[in-house]
Amino acid sequence: MTQTTAPHAASNYLRNIIEDDLAANRFQGKRWAGKPGPASMQASGLPDPARIRTRFPPEPNGYLHIGHAKSICVNFGIAKEFGGVCHLRFDDTNPEKEDQEYVDAIIEAVRWLGFDWNTDGNNNLYFASDYFEFMYEFAEALIEAGHAFVDEQSADDIRAQRGTLTEPGRNSPFRDRPAAESLTRLREMRDGKHPDGSLVLRARIDMASPNINLRDPVMYRVRHAAHHRTGDKWCIYPMYSWAHPVEDALEGITHSICTLEFEDQRPFYDWILARLADLGKLARPLPRQYEFSRLNMSYIVTSKRKLLQLVREGYVDGWDDPRMPTLFGLRRRGYTASAIRLFCDRTAVSKSDSRIDYSLLEQAVRDDLDPGTTRSVAVLDPLKLVITNYPKDQTEVCKAPRNPHDPEAGQREFPFSRELWIERDDFREEAPKKYFRLFPGNLVRLKYGYVVRCTGFTKDEAGNITEVQAEYLPDTKSGTPGADSVKVKGNITWVSAAHAVPAEVRLYDRLFADPHPDGGDKDFLACLNPNSIQTVQAWLEPGTRAEPGATWQFERLGYFTVDSKDSSPEAPVLNRIVTLKDSWAA
C-alpha cells in the first residue's frame, strides 16, 4: 500500500502504551545513579527524574538517511512529550565496519535535525563499547547459572543444526558441557587464545522452540579486530541481539522502540533481561521492546550497500550529493530540519507496513518554506527582450513584496531597463490555443512592471530565436493609478539584463525514475533517473545575494538555496530544493 496523502496529525500507537504505563505507575521505584550501570550501581541512585527513557541507537558504520530521521523523531519526540529523556547511543559492537568519522557525522546530523540528549543535567551520549566489561561479567554469570555455554563447532555446523520453521533444531554436542569448562573457554576467547570463528558463546534456551531466534542463539564471537574506541583491548565482541537488551537495561531505558524486523527478537530480548535480573545483575523494572514499521518511501533506496555503490561507482557526487536520501544530502539540497520533522510528524507510527510517496516529503518542504521564504526572480533559460520604445540609458525601480504572507517583511526593489531577460518558454513565434504569454501582436504584463506588446523577433542563421522586441505602454506600471487601464491575460517574470546576477543553477529531481527501485529482482541502477540533475546558466534578480544558507522562492519556478559546497561569492551555485507543485503527479 502506498500512502499519498497524510493526515494533519498522524496516529502514534506508542502514545497509548506509554499513557497506560504511566497511569499504572509501572516505573514507580525506578532509580537512576546519574549514569548507566548494573543493579548494584542503580540501587544507590535517586528516583529517576525522567518519567520515561528512550534511545536512538545507530551503528556508526554509515551516514544517517531519511529513514533514520523517522526513528530519531519518534524516540526524541515521544520522550519530550511525556517528560522523559532520549539517549543517543552508538551501538559500536562490530569493529570491522565502524569508524569515528561516522560517530562525528551522526552527532552532527542529530543536532542539525534539532534534537539534544543533554536534557536532564546529564550528557546522555553513550557507547555500547563502554559496557563491554559489564557484558563480559554478565556472560560469565549466565554460564555459571547454566544459561549459556561455549560451542566449538564451526558456523556451518551450528547453522545446519538450527532447524527450519517446520523442523526443530538439534542440540550442540557442547551444550551440556560443565560450566567450568565453558568458563575456561570463554576466558581463553577473551585472552586471544583462539582464532576468529573457532568458538562462540551461545545462550542455552530451547532448540525446539518455534521461534528460531530462541534456538540457542550466539552471544559472543571471536574477532581479532581493532576497535575505534577500545583499540586492541578486546578480541571478542557481543552479537547485537545480546548487546541490545543489556545496553537498554544498563541505561534504564523504559521503552525500547525498534523497527519491525526486531519483532521476532523480542522473546530473546525478554529472556536475557529476565535471566540477568534474576541473577541480580540488572535493575527492575526492566525495559520493554516495542516495534513500529520502518519508513519505506517511493523513489529512493536506503540500503547502505546500495548507497555505497552509488557513491563508489560515481553515480552521485558523494554522501552529501543533493539527490541522496542521506540527511547530509537533504541538507545540502536545501531541505530544512523543520521540514523533515514536519514530514515525520505527518507519517503514522504503527505496526502496518506501508510505502510513503516521496511527494509527501516534498510537500512538507513546501509547507515549511513558504511562510518565511523571501521571493525573488530568476531566469533559467534566458531569451533577451528589448523594449524598443524605452529610453536606452534610463533605469527605474520596480517593487514587489518580499513575502506575500508577511506584510511586515516589506518590499524588495529591483531595476527595470530597456533590455531584459525572460524565460525562453514565455515566447512563441506561433502561439497555441490558450497560450497567453508573448507572441507577435499579443499584450502581456511584465510582472511588477509594465504591459508590453510584442512587435517582432530575431533569429540566427540556424533558425533559433535570439531576441524578442516589444513596446511598453507607459501608463501601465504596476502600483500606479493606470496599472489596470489595460487588461491582459498573461504575466511573465523578467530581470534587467544590465543588472542581473549570473549564477549556475542545478535543477535536481528524484534520483530514481521508478517508484520502487529496490523492488523484486530489479537492478536498481537501471532505475536511475537520467534527468535527476540538469545544470543551467541563469540570471538572478540583482538583490539575490548568494550568501551561505540563503534560500528563496523564485517566482513560478520553485525554492532554491545556495550550494554549501561549490558556491562562492564570485561564482554562485544554487540548488533547486523543490518545485512549486508536484511535477510527478499523475
Swiss-Prot record:
Signal peptide: none annotated. It is an enzyme of class 6 (ligase). L-glutamine binds at residues 91, 240. One of its GO terms (biological process) is glutamyl-tRNA aminoacylation. Its EC number is 6.1.1.18. It is found in: Cytoplasm. GO terms for cellular component: cytosol. Keywords: Aminoacyl-tRNA synthetase, ATP-binding, Cytoplasm, Ligase, Nucleotide-binding, Protein biosynthesis. It catalyses: tRNA(Gln) + L-glutamine + ATP = L-glutaminyl-tRNA(Gln) + AMP + diphosphate. It comes from the Bacteria. Its main location: cytoplasm. A motif ('HIGH' region) lies at residues 58-68. ATP binds at residues 59-61, 65-71, 259, 294-295. GO terms for molecular function: ATP binding; glutamine-tRNA ligase activity. Monomer. This is Glutamine--tRNA ligase.
